[in-house]
Amino acid sequence: VTSPLTSLSLVSNSGDAGYLGSVTIDGTMLRDPLTVNGDSLATNFNPFNTDINTVRGQEGIYATLNAKDYRSFTNGPTYYIYNGGLTTYMSGGSANASKDRGLVASTMDLPSGKKWYCEINVENISNNDIALGIASQLVKGYYELGGNPKPGAYLLRAAGQFYYPTGQLGTDSSRSWATGDLIGLAVDLESTTKTITFYKNSKVLYTHIVDESEGPFKFAAGTDAGSGNDYKLNFNFGQKPFKFPPPD
């Protein structure tokens, strides 16, 4: 049997004990230490980099939060959008009436005939003056006083209040969510009965029928908070693997 090993090289420096410097197998030299071949340059790519601008960027078929949506401008609270359009920081303010205190919304409408899903990591909320869900372009804020309907909106507040086009549900701990929760939003515009389902840490939190004529909708979040309160949400529209599998 012919060995593929064709040579060995022993190296000794100034009388020191020698070491194996290279091995040649089938004409290929394996050396120690490694040396650069030609004009090769190091790369700054890091496979463990979690910065979305570096890993994937903002281009592609995925939604992000829309920093150009006028509702995210200063409307009492101030909305900051960063991390490639996937993180929003909200700082409370009271310049406008409650129902007009703004939203952050996705760049894409949710087209009819499909199922849509996103996850929201609730990194911090100062109180329950914040809501998540879907909203049409007509919605300028999540909050309406006194149980009034909220046309174009299906939004769940942290204390469990739910705002929808023909009414409002009151506080309910069974629908509540808080700092540290991972909220999934599943919108089914494909089935005969259209629905939005809210998940908390993979468990169903609440489901409501959607009137598609109130749309088109975008994923949205907003706060009604006054000064001194802040909130931070991290969205995933599919740019990265979801923590929990989307529903069928």
Question: Residues of each region from the PLM?
Answer:
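Short beta-strand-plus-loop segments that form exposed binding edges in beta-rich domains
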Residues: 9-18, 222-226
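PRY/SPRY (B30.2) beta-sandwich protein-interaction domains
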Residues: 24, 28-248
